[in-house]
């Protein structure tokens, strides 16, 4: 038979005849099972057209259902796909029976055809995929010898083939067939019901019966006689709808058929048989006409199909046996429908038509394709055989394809994926600290309920069985986790304080998440599915007991992040650096399983690729016990939940934490994960029809089960275990068993003896964990899969609940009173269902499938393996070692290869490390035990980061004649690199070097120098790339002699092709021009100076100076022999090197010219991408000029001074003592040189060793590198062998647990809320800060309310209060943004000062002319930042006063107003000097020409390109990028010319009108903030690392008013002060029309590290919440006090850091570079330091972070101690208050370890 290929363009044509027959009957077997299998096939990637057809058909049916009358529409249940309609057989007996019968028949036949067609031609699944990819091509059924036939509604299905030009067309046309069948059914029902209404009281009646053995003429005569006698109306007459030689079918209204059959002797004689036709009449010409047919097919979709398709394959009419004659798609549909409605079925005519066709075409055979063999097909085969001599007929059934099970399941997309559970962990009541202990508890049938333990609350005072005492529990029982406070805080980077304040359930959630991930073999970014951006966390939590009760007793720093639910999964995401979603879900009792369903949905939607999910519950709040008691939820009697017991009286509350890890199944399989269970489907619904919100509803539960089973594509009878919700309440248990039996053990369709169903409920063992209940049940089922057993149910203490069905045995449903085996069954899968219901009405159900078996006979070819153990603490390190040894003792047959894979590629690696290389398990145990013995002396890898790595490339002296490299044979990457290099070499005309490395020759076989040298360099290049692929990347390289070529390639100097060319060409020249063996090389174990002394007067050459005592000499053979004899005679060891030529000697001179010429021609030398240590030059090369053809010439001839090169590299810090050296070559030689030259070097390792298996050498080196802190890509190392390796379920991390627990004290939970104080008015007044105002006419945008004023003679005082949140004030502040927040610029202070100064003067000097004012000596100690909450006021208070106005001076102070309406300490001060502007103008005249001269000089510098000129937009863009983002009205500078710290600007003031001002702040700022621009934009300041702000000025005065729209020019030059290099001073001159009209004199700027910007400029939520302590002024430091960063033009005042107890001062003490870290020691170390500031500081740190002083070793980092940013601010404030040490929160970033901080404190504060 020809085979279709994509290239052929169409399916092959056949000479034989083909007939495709569509039946009119649905299969008699399990229809639901067939549709379920179709659904599963549609989820497979190999059947995209099947999925599309089902989708299109579903849409078509839904559209038709929408158009039904309301009453009929209500009969149709919600359906996910059209396939779901098979689940409702009762619908096929009602008004939609005909429609649904037709829909299901057409769907089944067309879907089967789509799935089966490729298998008519292809055996392999891959070929089927290829077929579908080319489905747009024509397929075989369109050959000219193909015909279609059908009976009844099957005739409609023929259109799906007849109209299609390609298989890809079938889904759309097939969906139209389904639509037409639905419409045909509704029409037939409507017409038929007009003849005889449906009898709904009993079983449906038939509309057709068959009369066997009768002749059509006799039947028609009898009917005619009866109709005449009965005077039957024409529409109601019984008629003949079909006949053949052996029978006649009559049709008509059911009651009339019954009457005829009862009264007619003729029909009684023929034993009439009723047909299952319940939906009305077809084949009735007297009832239907062409108009009916056109009504059925008149749809918009039909018009679209008619435009695209036309009939291509003939279809036989069932009445005449001739093909339909339609030429259009619409015409064919109309003829098909009309045939069904009006024409009788004469199958004999169809048979004759096929016979005639075969005869006419001289066909000798016919392939008949049928869905199932039936009587019409047998008639056809008989006729063909009898009427056509020698005619062969073959028949193939299509339905069996549906029943086939594929060996390969490929989901079509993520939505069709199964979900694999790959890791799990738990903490459960009864001491179940892991899943194994949990199983032991279940297996033993334990009930772990007990009295409420004392660490929760005092049960004696909080329990009242009578329920009379307020707020008490009615039960004293529960199921509890042992010691829920245990936690390894340092592991999770949490301080003891934070750990103590964090909810224990959230702590245990992150612990179990880690354990589940560890068991899942999770390593971040190891595979696409473990990409950190694609991992999410989902946890269910339904209570906040610990936050509400325990931590609420003394609210502190971590009350919110430690207790609020969102932080649980959020903390897991943060710790693991997952960037996917984190959800905390509360659906009451179903929280965890509903959350797991949400997690599955995330995977199905493709939102995530891996999820960590679970639930958590730790009970500490007596209120919940009381509330549930009063709600009648809880059992009052001892024991866990009495599930299914006659005396069940409520549930028993329980703790629990459970975590699982999930991926899509295909990802888990690709990632080589252990699959411990599979989720096939999950869903949630709500018991909306229940009698109350807390009451269950059997109907809702049953509906949910159907939905889940349908989505899973699983027959409910195939489910063998249901884990029920089973809380032990009378209502809940009885309702749930009703819904379970209805769906999973129905009485109508019973389970076979081979299909037992067991039920269980874990709450009988460990109680109801509420939010954790669902995942607890899920873990139980996963353990059942692992253990192949069902644990006993222990909830029935007395007898079974009488509300349970009495026929459980008949239903084959069993309660396991004892442990029951649950083995795997070959060829079948174990399915289980887990239920989890919510007290709030939600129902969640998950369908599980057993994990697949994995078998392999793979043998890892590697002879040695690496096993790693690590931990974050020494205690855990020892425990982890001990656990692994114990595991190996218990599992002596453990695969070493899989153990290595698990502990390297599938584990995180912490700083305490053990790494062993071994060839068997016994060796592993021995080496691990040696680690345990030395654990106290073990040192962790440094926390400073991985060490530098240097590659040393071996020269030819280390090479051996023929190698047999195991890496070449077993490492695909290494092998491919060598083969690529060999191809490059051969491409340049050199011989292959592979025979020198593949073991094809004996080891002593001598290859040519060309092959030998090419092999050496290529092996080194391949080795280097292999190391780099394993994550070992060099920071520097050095090559010895020939090894330099490989080094140059790795450093990027030479391409691989050029390196091989140079090596090969050099070897060729040596072969051509030098005699092999004429010269020798001699290695001497002696310093060069000693050799020179011993050989004085002897001829020799120095080839290599390898080390202090390692020298290589060269010369002619005779010379070398003489030299060797002399040196040996004086005691020096000499070794003759086995090399063909004497390199680096005069022998090579013959090739130098030719070699240099070759190197010049076509070889490209590039700049190195890393330092290259040159043994030729004895220096480190960084540039692209040094390594040239000349260099290569010199390197060939001149001495290799390896010693000098290494010493120089160390001198220039290219390498140091911490550098790790990797020798790249076939045998380690250079390592000895390195160790001799740099004796303190960290580690030296080899790549290969002569005579040692490559894998043994490599493993030993990998262990050394790993323990040195080099980050190895273990996954890359194991990847080539991964499919044969298994992830072992090794012991999880051994925690260094300590108890962190805040005990609930007393009984305040019982007595709360009984005393109230009516302080509403007082509180409101405090909150609004309102004070009685003094009548005053003064009100501006910044001076809003005068709250106090007094005038006594020449003395006076005015106090104003303003709300910064008022629109104009807030707008002014937001016009000057720093770090994204509005900051009050000093120009606003200026406006306030001038306003109050004028008001004070006018009230003290009546009628006098107001003088001009100079606002002098402004000092701002702390900045003023607009708060975030604009709905609450933010008040400031400013006071101006004078003791004598005649003195011409008034004093100003600024204060914040606190929540209690008191004023804080002053944060700013200034003076108003009353003066005469005329005097100012006169005094400025001498300065005018000087200023003008500097402006002109700047202009010239700008013209010469020396100074920078900025446009307005550019200037303010730079300003915004560096510090201040000004609003438009502040942007007065139109252009700026800047050179170093000098600048001038042309200014136009804004004309925008907003607010009421004395001098608008944006006017002052525009003319003065040039100084800020200079300090924050000039390249004379390191603006990247620093920013500058001003604490004030000496004077601010304007001789003329600033006018909107007017033009001005400002000039400033800032000068660095001598006494403090961080402070700059300057005068800003404001000019108009060439004259100075204003001045901001003595403006000061201070430079601050940019890292402090967030610290100083962050908007508080509510500024008034800052405490007095936080806002108080800074205590005087040891040096001259300096104001903190504040604002004036161009910047803003530094606010108090807005956090609890933030320090007021932010001026850092000097911060020199930290000294090298001392060796770890408990701090303080020195005896004399006990009273030092440093010692007190450490005590304070320990106290605040709840640490022991012994924890504060010098090498301990604050990050690892849990001192986060929040804690840093708290400690910084304590330093200021208690030690007088003013620091910032960033101090712990600048000095990251205890030792760094201690050294700084000792230096500056002792």
Swiss-Prot record:
Biased composition (Low complexity): 1685-1708
Species annotation: Emericella nidulans (strain FGSC A4 / ATCC 38163 / CBS 112.46 / NRRL 194 / M139)
Domain statement: Multidomain protein; including a starter unit:ACP transacylase (SAT) that selects the starter unit; a ketosynthase (KS) that catalyzes repeated decarboxylative condensation to elongate the polyketide backbone; a malonyl-CoA:ACP transacylase (MAT) that selects and transfers the extender unit malonyl-CoA; a product template (PT) domain that controls the immediate cyclization regioselectivity of the reactive polyketide backbone; and an acyl-carrier protein (ACP) that serves as the tether of the growing and completed polyketide via its phosphopantetheinyl arm.
UniProt protein name: Atrochrysone carboxylic acid synthase
Residue ranges, compositional bias (Pro residues): 1709-1721
Alphabetized UniProt keyword annotations: Multifunctional enzyme, Phosphopantetheine, Phosphoprotein, Transferase
Span list, region Product template (PT) domain: 1340-1659
Region listing for C-terminal hotdog fold, in residue ranges: 1506-1654
Enzyme class: transferase
Designated gene of the protein: mdpG
Pathway: Secondary metabolite biosynthesis
The EC number(s) this enzyme carries: 2.3.1.-
Catalytic center residues: 589, 725, 768, 1376, 1565
Family annotation (InterPro entries): Ac_transferase_dom_sf, ACP-like_sf, Acyl_transferase_dom, Acyl_Trfase/lysoPLipase, Ketoacyl_synth_C, Ketoacyl_synth_N, Malonyl_transacylase_ACP-bd, PKS_Beta-ketoAc_synthase_dom
PROSITE patterns: CARRIER, KS3_2, PKS_MFAS_DH
Keyword Transferase attached: yes
Gene3D superfamilies in the cross-refs: 3.30.70.3290, 3.40.47.10, ACP-like, Malonyl-CoA ACP transacylase, ACP-binding, Malonyl-Coenzyme A Acyl Carrier Protein, domain 2, Polyketide synthase dehydratase
Domain Ketosynthase family 3 (KS3), residue spans: 416-850
List of residues that carry O-(pantetheine 4'-phosphoryl)serine: 1765
Domain spans labelled Carrier: 1728-1805
NCBIfam families listed in its UniProt record: PT_fungal_PKS (TIGR04532)
């Amino acid at each position: 038979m020809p085979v279709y290929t994509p290239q052929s363009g169409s399916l092959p044509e056949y000479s034989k005849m083909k007939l495709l027959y569509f039946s009119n009957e649905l299969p008699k077997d399990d229809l639901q099972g067939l549709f379920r299998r179709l659904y599963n096939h549609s989820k497979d990637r190999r059947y995209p057209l099947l999925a599309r057809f089902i989708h299109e058909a579903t849409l078509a049916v839904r559209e038709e259902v929408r158009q039904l009358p309301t009453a009929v529409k209500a009969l149709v249940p919600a359906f996910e796909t059209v396939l779901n309609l098979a689940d409702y057989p009762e619908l096929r007996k009602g008004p939609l029976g005909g429609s649904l019968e037709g829909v299901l028949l057409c769907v089944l036949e067309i879907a089967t055809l789509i799935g089966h067609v490729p298998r008519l031609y292809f055996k392999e699944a891959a070929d089927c995929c290829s077929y579908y990819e080319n489905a747009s091509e024509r397929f075989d059924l369109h050959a000219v010898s193909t015909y279609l036939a059908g009976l009844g509604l099957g005739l409609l299905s023929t259109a799906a083939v007849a109209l299609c030009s390609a298989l890809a067309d079938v889904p759309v046309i097939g969906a139209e067939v389904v639509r037409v069948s639905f419409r045909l059914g509704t029409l037939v029902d409507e017409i038929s019901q007009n003849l005889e209404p449906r009898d709904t009281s009993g079983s449906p009646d038939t509309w057709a019966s068959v009369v066997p053995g009768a002749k059509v003429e006799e039947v028609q005569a009898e009917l005619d006689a009866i109709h005449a006698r009965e005077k039957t109306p024409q529409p109601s007459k019984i008629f003949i709808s079909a006949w053949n030689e052996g029978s006649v079918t009559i049709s008509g209204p059911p009651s009339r058929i019954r009457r005829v059959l009862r009264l007619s002797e003729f029909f009684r004689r023929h034993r009439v048989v009723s047909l299952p036709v319940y939906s009305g009449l077809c084949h009735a010409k007297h009832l239907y006409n062409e108009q009916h047919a056109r009504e059925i097919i008149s749809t918009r979709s039909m018009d679209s199909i008619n435009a695209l398709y036309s009939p291509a394959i003939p279809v036989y009419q069932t009445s005449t046996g001739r093909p339909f004659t339609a030429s259009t798609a619409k015409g064919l549909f109309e003829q098909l429908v009309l045939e069904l409605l009006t024409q009788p079925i004469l199958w004999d005519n169809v048979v004759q038509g096929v016979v005639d066709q075969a005869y006419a075409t001289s066909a000798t055979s016919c392939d008949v394709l049928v869905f199932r063999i039936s009587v019409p097909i047998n008639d056809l085969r008989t006729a063909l055989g009898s009427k056509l001599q020698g005619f062969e007929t073959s028949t193939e059934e299509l339905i069996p394809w549906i029943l086939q099970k594929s060996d390969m399941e490929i989901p079509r997309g993520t939505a069709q994926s199964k979900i694999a559970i790959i890791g799990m962990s738990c903490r459960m009541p009864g001491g179940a600290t892991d899943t194994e202990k949990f199983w032991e508890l279940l297996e033993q049938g334990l009930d772990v309920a007990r009295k409420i333990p004392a660490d929760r609350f005092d049960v004696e005072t909080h329990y009242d069985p009578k329920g009379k005492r307020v707020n008490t529990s009615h039960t004293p029982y529960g199921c509890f986790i042992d010691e829920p406070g245990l936690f390894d805080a340092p592991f999770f980077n949490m301080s003891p304080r934070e750990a103590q304040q964090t909810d224990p359930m959230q702590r245990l959630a992150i612990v179990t998440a880690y354990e589940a991930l560890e068991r899942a073999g999770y390593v971040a970014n190891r595979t696409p599915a473990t990409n950190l951006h694609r991992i999410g966390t989902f946890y269910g939590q339904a209570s906040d007991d610990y936050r509400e009760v325990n931590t609420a007793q003394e609210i502190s720093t971590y009350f919110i992040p430690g207790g609020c639910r969102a932080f649980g999964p959020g903390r897991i995401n943060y710790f693991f650096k997952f960037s996917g979603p984190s959800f905390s879900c509360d659906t009451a009792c179903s929280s965890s399983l509903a959350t797991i369903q949400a997690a599955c949905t995330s995977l199905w939607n493709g939102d995530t690729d891996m999820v960590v999910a679970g639930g958590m519950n730790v009970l500490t709040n007596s209120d919940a016990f009381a509330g549930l008691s009063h709600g009648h939820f809880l059992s009052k009697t001892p024991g866990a939940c009495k599930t299914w017991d006659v005396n069940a009286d409520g549930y028993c509350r329980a703790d629990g934490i459970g975590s699982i890890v999930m991926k899509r199944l295909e990802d888990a399989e690709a990632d080589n994960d252990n699959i411990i269970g599979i989720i096939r489907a999950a869903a949630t619904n709500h018991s909306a029809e229940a009698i109350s919100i807390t009451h269950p509803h059997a109907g809702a539960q049953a509906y949910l089960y159907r939905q889940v089973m349908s989505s899973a594509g699983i027959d409910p009878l195939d489910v063998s275990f249901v884990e029920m919700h089973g809380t032990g309440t009378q209502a809940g248990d009885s309702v749930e068993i009703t819904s379970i039996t209805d769906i999973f053990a129905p009485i109508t369709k019973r389970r076979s003896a081979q299909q037992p169903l067991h039920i269980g409920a874990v709450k009988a063992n460990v109680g109801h964990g509420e939010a954790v209940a669902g995942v607890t049940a899920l873990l139980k089922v996963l353990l059942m899969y692992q253990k192949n057993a069902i644990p006993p149910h222990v909830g029935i203490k007395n007898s079974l609940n009488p509300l349970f069905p009495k026929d459980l045995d008949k239903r084959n449903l069993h309660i396991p009173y004892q442990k029951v085996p649950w083995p795997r069954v070959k060829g079948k899968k174990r399915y289980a269902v887990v239920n989890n219901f919510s007290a709030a009405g939600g129902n969640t159900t998950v369908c599980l499938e057993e994990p697949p078996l994995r078998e392999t006979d793979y043998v890892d070819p590697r002879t040695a393996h690496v096993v790693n153990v690590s931990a974050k603490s020494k205690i855990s390190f020892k425990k982890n070692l001990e656990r692994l040894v114990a595991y190996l003792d218990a599992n002596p047959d453990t695969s070493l290869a899989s153990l290595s894979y698990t502990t390297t590629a599938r584990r995180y690696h912490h700083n305490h490390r053990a790494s062993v290389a071994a060839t068997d398990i016994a060796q592993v145990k021995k080496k691990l035990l040696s680690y345990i013995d030395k654990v106290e002396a073990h040192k962790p890898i440094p926390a400073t980061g991985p060490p530098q790595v240097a590659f040393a490339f071996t020269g030819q002296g280390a090479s051996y004649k023929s190698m047999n490299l195991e890496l070449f044979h077993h490492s695909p990457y290494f092998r491919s690199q060598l083969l690529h290099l060999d191809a490059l070499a051969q491409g340049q005309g050199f011989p292959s070097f592979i025979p020198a490395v593949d073991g094809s020759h004996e080891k002593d076989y001598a290859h040519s120098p060309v092959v030998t040298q090419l092999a050496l360099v290529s092996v080194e290049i391949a080795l280097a790339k292999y190391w780099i692929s394993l994550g070992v990347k060099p920071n520097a390289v050095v090559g010895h002699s020939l090894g330099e070529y490989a080094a140059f390639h790795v450093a990027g100097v030479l391409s691989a092709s050029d390196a091989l060319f140079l090596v090969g060409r050099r070897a060729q020249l040596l072969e051509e021009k030098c005699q092999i063996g004429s010269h020798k090389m001699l290695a001497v174990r002696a310093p060069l100076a000693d050799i020179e002394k011993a050989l004085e007067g002897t001829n020799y050459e120095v080839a290599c100076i390898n080390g202090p005592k390692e020298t290589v000499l060269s010369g002619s053979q005779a010379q070398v022999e003489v030299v060797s004899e002399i040196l040996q005679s004086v005691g020096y060891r000499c070794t003759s090197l086995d090399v063909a030529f004497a390199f680096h000697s005069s022998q090579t001179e013959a090739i130098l010219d030719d070699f240099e010429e070759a190197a010049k021609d076509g070889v490209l030398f590039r700049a190195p991408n890393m330092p290259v240590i040159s043994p030729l030059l004895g220096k480190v090369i960084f540039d692209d000029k040094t390594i040239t053809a000349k260099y290569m010439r010199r390197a060939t001839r001149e001495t290799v001074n390896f010693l000098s090169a290494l010493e120089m590299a160390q001198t220039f810090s290219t390498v140091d003592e911490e550098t790790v050296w990797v020798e790249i070559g076939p045998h380690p030689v250079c390592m000895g040189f390195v160790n001799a030259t740099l004796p303190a070097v960290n580690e030296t390792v080899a790549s290969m060793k002569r005579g040692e298996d490559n894998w043994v050498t490599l493993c030993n080196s990998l262990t050394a590198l790993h323990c040195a802190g080099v980050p190895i890509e273990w996954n890359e190392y194991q990847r080539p062998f991964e499919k044969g390796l298994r992830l072992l379920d090794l012991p999880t991390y051994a925690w260094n647990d300590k108890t962190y627990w805040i005990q609930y004290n007393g009984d305040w939970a019982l007595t709360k809320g009984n005393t109230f104080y009516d302080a509403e008015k007082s509180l409101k007044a405090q909150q609004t800060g309102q004070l009685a105002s003094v009548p005053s006419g003064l009100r501006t945008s910044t001076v809003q309310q005068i709250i106090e004023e007094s005038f006594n003679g020449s003395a006076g005082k005015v106090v104003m209060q303003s709300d910064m949140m008022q629109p104009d004030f807030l707008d002014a502040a937001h016009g000057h943004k720093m770090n994204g927040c509005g900051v009050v610029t000093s120009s606003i202070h200026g406006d306030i000062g001038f306003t109050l100064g004028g008001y004070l003067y006018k009230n003290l000097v009546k009628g006098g002319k107001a003088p001009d004012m100079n606002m002098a000596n402004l000092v701002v100690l702390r900045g003023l930042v607009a708060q975030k909450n604009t709905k609450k006021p933010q008040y400031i208070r400013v006071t101006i006063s004078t003791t004598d106005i005649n003195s011409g001076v008034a004093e100003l102070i600024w204060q914040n107003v606190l929540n209690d309406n008191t004023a804080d300490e002053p944060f700013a001060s200034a003076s108003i000097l009353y003066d005469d502007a005329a005097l100012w103008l006169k005094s400025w005249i001498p300065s005018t020409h000087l200023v003008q001269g500097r402006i002109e000089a700047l202009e010239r510098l700008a013209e010469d390109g020396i100074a920078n000129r900025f446009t307005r937009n550019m200037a303010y863009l730079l300003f915004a990028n560096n510090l201040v983002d000004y609003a438009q009205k502040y942007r007065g500078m139109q252009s700026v010319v800047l050179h170093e710290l000098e600048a001038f600007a042309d200014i136009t003031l804004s004309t925008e009108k907003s607010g009421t001002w004395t001098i608008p702040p944006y006017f002052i700022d525009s003319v003065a903030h040039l100084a800020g621009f200079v300090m924050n934009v000039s390249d004379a300041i390191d603006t990247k690392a620093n920013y500058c702000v001003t604490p004030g000025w000496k004077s601010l005065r304007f001789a003329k008013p600033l006018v909107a729209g007017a033009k001005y020019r400002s000039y400033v030059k800032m000068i660095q002060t001598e006494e403090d290099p961080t402070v700059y001073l300057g005068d800003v001159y404001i000019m108009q029309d060439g004259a100075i009209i204003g001045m901001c004199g003595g403006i000061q700027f201070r430079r601050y590290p940019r890292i402090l910007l967030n610290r100083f400029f962050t908007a508080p939520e509510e500024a008034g919440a800052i405490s007095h302590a936080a806002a108080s002024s800074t205590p005087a430091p040891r040096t001259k006090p300096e104001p903190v960063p504040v604002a004036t033009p161009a910047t803003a005042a530094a606010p108090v850091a807005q956090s609890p107890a933030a320090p007021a001062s932010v001026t850092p003490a000097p911060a020199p570079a930290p000294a090298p870290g001392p060796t770890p020691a408990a701090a303080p170390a020195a005896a004399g330091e006990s009273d030092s500031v440093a010692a007190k500081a450490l005590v304070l740190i320990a106290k605040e972070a709840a640490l022991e002083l012994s924890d504060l070793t010098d090498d301990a980092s604050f990050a690892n101690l849990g001192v986060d940013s929040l804690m840093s601010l708290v400690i910084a404030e304590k330093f200021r208050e208690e030690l007088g040490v003013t620091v910032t929160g960033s101090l712990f970033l600048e000095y990251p370890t205890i030792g760094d901080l201690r050294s700084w404190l000792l230096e500056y504060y002792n």
